[in-house]
């Protein structure tokens, strides 16, 4: 097969999978009030359509990463497209909230297979000269999903055809399956003989359920203590997981390997920080535009596009000028620009023109555009080729968890200081700024000592 065609098809499969899996979260978020009315249920029950998807994705992504190393990234990606497509069709055809939640759980498992394999498909199968460009496109898809979701969801709901929020996935799934199937028939992958770590998977699942459910309860004052208990339980389970996996030959996460490779730990710390920061960037600005500047929802929806616009543009630009040897430099540049944007956002007050807030978001997007593709490439390059699927899955899981933590802390700030929006947002920006500075400082320290 023509190498250029192969690279194109792999990039389509990886990018399409990442876009679908991130797009679907944003679409369902805006549909919650509609689903509550449609199924005559409570907000808490309707919210399980989000919680079920998120938990299924988080729990299954690491095992699917291991399976992709064992059986092949293309096979697991193919499974992901099929499962995601069938569950999307199921969700679009049923008219029962319990069945919808079940469908969303299977959709989350399909999304996990797509996210677990996206970066690994590129790093193991795309030619060296196009690898960075493909990773840049993957970064664009990661940035587009969360922002296109709410916009697309709003348009679909305005048509009074809520089933379309699920059925719209089908044409893209068919394209992904067609490309994936063609590649499966033309390519062979090098696989390893890793075994599934059932004990590690079980502890990891319990840890993630406790953490994510605990985070979801933090902004409910009457359940705040329960949320804290669940989060503390997840920390205890995390400690148990660490010691169980440390000397496990078939560990779900190669703890011993990570301890011997502090470079990867530094990159993963950056990933977590960026996920946390991105959650704040998407959560806080709409409140500022609507409550401080008294703008309409339509205007707000347009003005918050600053961050994803910057991320999409500069993901493409940075990947064009980076041939793979500038990943460390671009990571540092990206984090430094993010720090500048957070300082700018921290200083903004309602007396400033609201356009400056969009400018601050755009500057953040520029930093993200430099940082994210370089960070993904750095993590994958620093990991052995035989565990690229597991590494990609770990990177996505950590970023997803960081997004959940950032969203929970941001929402908690807004609830605690509900009468002082400026203070609430500044505390959110301040926490984020400190984390990014620590992340950049630790990375620079590592490379300086190296």
What are these regions (language model features)?
Residues 22, 26, 92, 108-116, ...:
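Small-residue-rich segments within alpha-helical transmembrane domains of MFS-like 12-TM solute carriers
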Residues 8-20, 28-30, 43, 226-230, ...:
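12-transmembrane solute porter fold
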Residues 159-273, 277, 302-303:
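Hydrophobic transmembrane-helix bundles of small-molecule transporters
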Residues 65-199:
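Helix-loop-helix hairpins in multi-pass membrane proteins, especially solute transporters
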Residues 31-61, 298-302:
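Extracellular/periplasmic helix-loop-helix junction of adjacent transmembrane segments
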Residues 35-36, 67-68, 152-160, 215, ...:
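Interfacial helix-cap and linker-helix signal at transmembrane-aqueous boundaries
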Residues 51-65, 115-119, 305-317:
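Central cavity-lining transmembrane alpha-helices of secondary-active solute carriers
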């Amino acid at each position: 097969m023509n190498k250029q065609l192969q690279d194109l098809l792999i990039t389509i499969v990886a990018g399409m999978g990442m876009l679908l899996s991130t797009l679907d979260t944003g679409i369902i978020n805006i549909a919650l009030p509609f689903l509550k009315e449609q199924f005559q249920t409570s907000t808490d029950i309707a919210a399980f359509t989000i919680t079920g998807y998120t938990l299924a994705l988080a729990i299954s992504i690491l095992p699917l990463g291991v399976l992709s190393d064992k059986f092949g990234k293309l096979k697991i990606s193919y499974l992901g497209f099929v499962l995601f497509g069938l569950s999307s069709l199921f969700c679009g055809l049923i008219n029962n909230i319990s069945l919808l939640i079940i469908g969303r759980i299977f959709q989350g498992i399909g999304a996990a297979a797509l996210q677990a394999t996206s970066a690994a498909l590129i790093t193991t199968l795309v030619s060296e000269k196009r690898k960075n460009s493909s990773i840049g496109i993957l970064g664009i898809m990661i940035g587009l999903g969360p922002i296109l979701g709410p916009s697309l969801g709003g348009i679909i709901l305005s048509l009074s055809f809520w089933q379309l929020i699920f059925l719209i996935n089908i044409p893209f799934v068919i394209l992904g399956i067609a490309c994936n199937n063609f590649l499966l028939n033309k390519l062979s992958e090098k696989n390893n003989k890793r075994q599934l770590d059932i004990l590690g998977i079980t502890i990891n699942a319990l840890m993630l359920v406790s953490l994510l459910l605990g985070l979801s309860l933090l902004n409910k004052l009457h359940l705040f203590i329960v949320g804290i208990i669940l989060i503390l339980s997840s920390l205890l389970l995390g400690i148990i997981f660490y010691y169980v996996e440390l000397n496990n030959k078939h560990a779900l996460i190669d703890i011993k390997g990570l301890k011997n490779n502090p470079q990867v730990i530094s990159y993963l710390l950056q990933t977590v920080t960026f996920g946390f920061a991105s959650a704040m960037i998407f959560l806080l600005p709409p409140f500022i535009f609507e409550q401080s500047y008294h703008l309409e929802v339509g205007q707000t929806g347009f003005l918050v596009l600053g961050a994803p616009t910057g991320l999409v543009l500069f993901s493409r630009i940075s990947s064009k000028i980076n041939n793979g040897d500038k990943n460390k430099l671009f990571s540092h540049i990206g984090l430094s620009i993010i720090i500048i944007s957070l300082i700018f956002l921290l200083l903004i007050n309602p007396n400033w023109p609201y356009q400056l807030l969009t400018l601050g978001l755009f500057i953040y997007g520029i930093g993200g555009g430099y940082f994210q593709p370089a960070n993904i490439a750095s993590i994958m390059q620093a990991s052995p080729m035989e565990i690229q699927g597991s590494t990609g899955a770990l990177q996505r899981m950590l970023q997803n968890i960081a997004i959940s933590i950032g969203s929970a802390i941001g929402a908690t700030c807004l609830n605690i200081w509900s009468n002082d929006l400026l203070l609430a947002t500044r505390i959110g920006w301040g926490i984020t700024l400190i984390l990014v500075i620590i992340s950049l400082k630790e990375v620079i320290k590592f490379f300086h000592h190296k």
